[in-house]
């Protein structure tokens, strides 16, 4: 059986890891073992934070909608409840965009939601 020399592959693999760790501080960018650990952790953080970003944006949209709704004399909770009662399906991303860039359209949606809410919100629905 022929002898297999692995130096080229090993160097290529190590160079790829060290290039991926090039911006890190101290040993993490210079020593292979430390760089490999850090690159592995960085990929894990990257994956988890891509999932977390969705929740972060939803939280931001809700804060923006709530602030704009309160300027129009309503709370976020009542606004969403009123929009559902009026069968208006607008997601939070679009609502936040309207709240920031088109205050008149947002105010119109608040008005529609207010009219759709019953006078006593906690009263049971008439069947």
UniProtKB/Swiss-Prot annotation:
InterPro entries according to UniProt: Ribosomal_bL20 (IPR005813), RIBOSOMAL_L20_CS (IPR049946), Ribosomal_protein_bL20_C (IPR035566)
SUPFAM superfamilies: Ribosomal protein L20
GO cellular component: ribonucleoprotein complex; ribosome
GO molecular function: rRNA binding; structural constituent of ribosome
Function, as annotated: Binds directly to 23S ribosomal RNA and is necessary for the in vitro assembly process of the 50S ribosomal subunit. It is not involved in the protein synthesizing functions of that subunit.
Recorded family membership: Belongs to the bacterial ribosomal protein bL20 family.
Protein name per its UniProtKB record: Large ribosomal subunit protein bL20
Biological source species: Streptomyces griseus subsp. griseus (strain JCM 4626 / CBS 651.72 / NBRC 13350 / KCC S-0626 / ISP 5235)
